[in-house]
């Protein structure tokens, strides 16, 4: 052998010993190996690559050990589990290094998901940071142990779920050509309704049957199109036999619990009925003049969406309401209607519509009999051909569509005992139960995941006897029998049909324990465990973070007073820019040493501002010439001391001195509010403006918690705890709709941890974020640089500043006191299930006042509220001249400030 061949053998043996069997995978071009110098370079490169490979392998094992800690297991994971995780990783083609930060649900998503989203809000990251110091001992800390007991997440399973989360779309609307007309399919495609969800695919054909239907599906699955498309198609099918006009009256009636949802449903019907001018869609929700609504009803409405109270009023008082050709009555978000306590109105509406339909059908039936008798009388005088012409009259064509029955449809995402009783009362015609079900025992993450997921999701369609609507209790059956007997008495004894509220609540609680809820898998749910004092600052950080990432957040609150208070407060909050020199000693006690906040540029701006104020005052008060005033030698310290005399001694900030250079936290951000006490115009205006604008925040009560759809809504924040368990599910369902990603955050105190266990029983798991982590992020990323010199107690510094803002504004004080008192009363209206967890007695009222930025004690706040109510009443009454002077006097205002 040549020397050259011997060198080749040695180099090959060396590379095989170092790299083993995997050396083949790293050698790209074997043919080019010829010269000895190039061979040495390549071999060195191979050695370096293999060393890096070994290091990365060791780090992966260490990271898997950390995962074992996060699971709560003292033992490390097996090698088989490691191989399975690596196989899943390779199969799913996820980009990025397989390190500890990537093993979390925030980052393991589709390629479209942004890496920056929710990096700061990951509780696994917090756990990993805490576990890094304890990794050597393999012993978690107490905080970690508490979190792990609550979390109990199998990371391997959740990771697979988030990689292969379920696609709710299944087919296209053009696949339903055998049911839907071409024109309707074209209108759907023009309006970008191309794909349909699995619940739409299975339920739309069933709506063409005459049976009553109860449709139950998760939020964001497209339930409105499930009934909107068949209702329009049924009217189009009538067109083949009869000319459709507005005089025929209402064909489809949709009942909605709120105005906003009714408007949204009506907008969808208006879009789908644009090519059909003879189909008129309209909305009646109250708040308008009845004359205008009656005029619209006289002209004729084909598809009417309305609220229950307004419809009941028109059924009782408006004669122009035509229901002769009524085909469908749809109750959307039925659980919300029951929660609002309007189930009695719906029973009345159902009975009245049923009575009207039977009367009109009997009239038509009598007409038919008269015509038949007339035909029989004239048989001898007429031929058979003439008789056929009589039977083919246009009036008979219209009469064949007049029926004594109509299709009743219930649509909801949840089910409870009160809903069952209402459904059993209204759904009487061979009721069909449609629900999306899951089979247990099918594990995701294998190669055949997609085929298994299709078999995993099933649409169950069953009769009343086999459905969850069947109530097996004898007491309930007796109640239903009593209700059926009272139906024929023209609703004279409607109060006897209602059960006691306490009995209904107990039945609801027992029934809720058996139900489990389904939510979209792409929805990320977080629970923020905080102390009461940290609550407001955590909210500010989350809102600022959403604005930076260009996300639209919705904040749910318990009452309308806190909604109005937060709106005014967020608009008026600004960073502290000027510190009183009189109170610099107070700041030194808080911190060892504080550098002056004002810089030279700020001093120049302040000097110019003060100079102009002096010029204006002298010009208006003394009428001096502006040129004669010597303002060049103005002393800033003397002027500031004069301004400080007007301020209270306890304030840290001179509020009036820094108006010219305030930096507002939510500058150029639109903050909208929605609650039931707003006027109709304001509600509609805020609703439409928020849906159109991008850089905006919505503060609201539970008025939009059900059925409302916002396209670009990505964050839901529940600042106050839910009063009912179902309320949490519906609020969370405003985001992550139609396969879009979204995140939901729930604020909970540490004493309210048991609520997470209740959600676990309902197949809902939340990741926990500690409040301290959010506050640390707030200190790092949100506080401006000129305030970082304050030191560690920056939060107390900022809180005192915000308290002075509230103190100086009378409207903020009034709104804050009313919001504080209403939040306390809201805890007393929680359901019996949650009353032990969200108990008003467990809340520290002083800390609650601290979150509302109120300096006074709870007793002082209640006294202040009584005085304000007394003053407001006195202002409305007729006052004497002395009383008016007393209210305007400075002495009276000073007394109020002291109080």
Curated annotation (Swiss-Prot):
Residues 76-85, 106-121, 476-487 have a biased composition (Acidic residues). One of its GO terms (biological process) is RNA metabolic process. The keyword Transit peptide does not apply. Residues 86-102, 488-503 have a biased composition (Low complexity). GO terms for cellular component: nucleolus. A motif (Q motif) lies at residues 173-201. It is found in: Nucleus, Nucleolus. ATP binds at residues 217-224. Residues 1-12, 21-31 have a biased composition (Basic residues). One of its GO terms (molecular function) is ATP binding. SMART domains: DEXDc (SM00487), DUF4217 (SM01178), HELICc (SM00490). It catalyses: ATP + H2O = ADP + phosphate + H(+). It comes from the Eukaryota. Has DNA helicase activity and may also have RNA helicase activity; the DNA helicase direction was not determined. Shows ssDNA and RNA dependent ATPase activity. Belongs to the DEAD box helicase family. DDX31/DBP7 subfamily. This is ATP-dependent DNA helicase DDX31.
